[in-house]
Amino acid sequence: MEFDFDVHKIFLEPITKLDSSLIPSRRPLIASSEAQKQIMTVIDEIGKASAKAQRLPAPITSASRMQTNKHHLYILKDCTPKTAGRGAVIGFLKVGCKKLFVLDQKGSHIEAEPLCILDFYIHETLQRHGFGKELFTFMLKNEQVDVHHLAIDRPSEKFLSFLRKHFNLWSTIPQVNNFVVFDGFFRDWKASVKKTPAKRTEGEIKPYSLTDRDFLKQEEGLPWPFSQSQLNLNRASSLGSSPTRACSRHSPGEEDFVKSLRNCRPHSLHRTANSEQEDHSQRRRTSSLNRPQSIHH
């Protein structure tokens, strides 16, 4: 892919790595403001070409996206003599770490943050010339990552064929998201991974916790005489008889107590309480009258 400016002046190396600053490790040979503008143009154009090749509705690689994400962009330029004039861009590879929930071979959910292949493009006229393998191998060495530990975002069939041919990646582990991981992804894993606990089924959910159950067992019983009826209820339940019949039977002492409560009238109880208060106040007056007076000399 050619441009109307000199690519060799902004990309001094065969493969240039860019981050969110869009500044190459080796400074361009032109002014920084002009170099920044040209670099942004290259990123936008190769992003559009990649989206068109993958039949995407919109580019997933652009200068603005690079500036707002912690991604790494590897740009491969053509260094052959035929492009010695202004140069040309062959393709690019975009990677970045993402937090994912991936499934292992046993179906367990694993929380991981692997390096992900987010976009990969080689110009149509320069494919099957070894440029893709050169770019991919350079990225693996620079990121210091094993090819089996990569997660790939929505790879095309052509990309999967490329990985099988050059990196012997055949067997994949089925996932529920758009990422593809290969057999060996969890082998010799160096990054931090975290297994999420499996969700309990409805049958395993208890109505009370153990502490609640212990608390319910330690509840105090009802005071006498109501505790006797409760005891009879428990005995009847344990023997298999009807609890209603057990509750209807009362002991002789309990029957007398219940009858006395029924026959006792509220106003008579109130009168008795008032008479007790009057007697108590009368005793206090009498004691105060009988108390000897103090003698003053």
Curated annotation (Swiss-Prot):
Q: What does this protein do?
A: Specifically acetylates 'Lys-40' in alpha-tubulin on the lumenal side of microtubules. Promotes microtubule destabilization and accelerates microtubule dynamics; this activity may be independent of acetylation activity. Acetylates alpha-tubulin with a slow enzymatic rate, due to a catalytic site that is not optimized for acetyl transfer. Enters the microtubule through each end and diffuses quickly throughout the lumen of microtubules.
Q: What is its EC number?
A: 2.3.1.108
Question: What GO biological process, any one, is recorded here?
Answer: neuron development
Lineage start: Eukaryota, Metazoa, Chordata, Craniata, Vertebrata
- Which residues participate in acetyl-CoA binding? 120-133, 156-165
Gene Ontology molecular function terms on file: L-lysine N-acetyltransferase activity, acting on acetyl phosphate as donor; tubulin N-acetyltransferase activity
Q: Name one GO cellular component term.
A: focal adhesion
Q: Which UniProt keywords apply?
A: Acyltransferase, Cell junction, Cell projection, Coated pit, Cytoplasm, Cytoskeleton, Membrane, Transferase
Q: Which residues form the N-acetyltransferase domain?
A: 1-186
- Highest rank taxon of the organism: Eukaryota
Enumerate the subcellular locations listed in this protein's record, separating them with semicolons: Cytoplasm; Membrane, Clathrin-coated pit; Cell junction, Focal adhesion; Cell projection, Axon
| Positions of region (Disordered) | 269-297
InterPro entries with a match to the protein in the record: Atat, GNAT_ATAT
Name of this protein = Alpha-tubulin N-acetyltransferase 1
- Composition skew (Polar residues), residue ranges: 287-297
Family from the record: Belongs to the acetyltransferase ATAT1 family.
- The record lists the organism as Xenopus tropicalis (Western clawed frog)
